[in-house]
Amino acid sequence: MADALKKGSLIRVNREAYLSSVEAKASAGDPPAYLLEGPGEVLAVKGDYAQLRFRQPVPDIWLRMDQLEAYAGS
């Protein structure tokens, strides 16, 4: 599914993939709810990574594409 993601795609972070990642191990505590609930927007893609922006007053972040899934909405 991450292969279909491109600039402008709405995403959410896959809980299992993120929690077992190096990025999660380097972060303090549990991930914030907005990260796992979405939606976030893909701003750029470089190699295996995507730059993400969430509708929160937080900095943009880079995560591996295999940790992302398309946002289905609600």
UniProtKB/Swiss-Prot annotation:
It is a peripheral membrane protein. It comes from the Bacteria. GO terms for molecular function: oxidoreductase activity, acting on NAD(P)H, quinone or similar compound as acceptor; quinone binding. Its main location: membrane. One of its GO terms (cellular component) is plasma membrane-derived thylakoid membrane. It is found in: Cellular thylakoid membrane. It holds the Pfam family NdhO. Disulfide bonds: none annotated. The keyword Transmembrane does not apply. Its EC number is 7.1.1.-. HAMAP family: NDH1_NDH1O. It catalyses: a plastoquinone + NADH + (n+1) H(+)(in) = a plastoquinol + NAD(+) + n H(+)(out); a plastoquinone + NADPH + (n+1) H(+)(in) = a plastoquinol + NADP(+) + n H(+)(out). NDH-1 shuttles electrons from an unknown electron donor, via FMN and iron-sulfur (Fe-S) centers, to quinones in the respiratory and/or the photosynthetic chain. The immediate electron acceptor for the enzyme in this species is believed to be plastoquinone. Couples the redox reaction to proton translocation, and thus conserves the redox energy in a proton gradient. Cyanobacterial NDH-1 also plays a role in inorganic carbon-concentration. InterPro entries: NdhO. Keywords: Membrane, NAD, NADP, Plastoquinone, Quinone, Thylakoid, Translocase, Transport. The keyword Translocase applies. It is an enzyme of class 7 (translocase). Belongs to the complex I NdhO subunit family. NDH-1 can be composed of about 15 different subunits; different subcomplexes with different compositions have been identified which probably have different functions. This is NAD(P)H-quinone oxidoreductase subunit O.
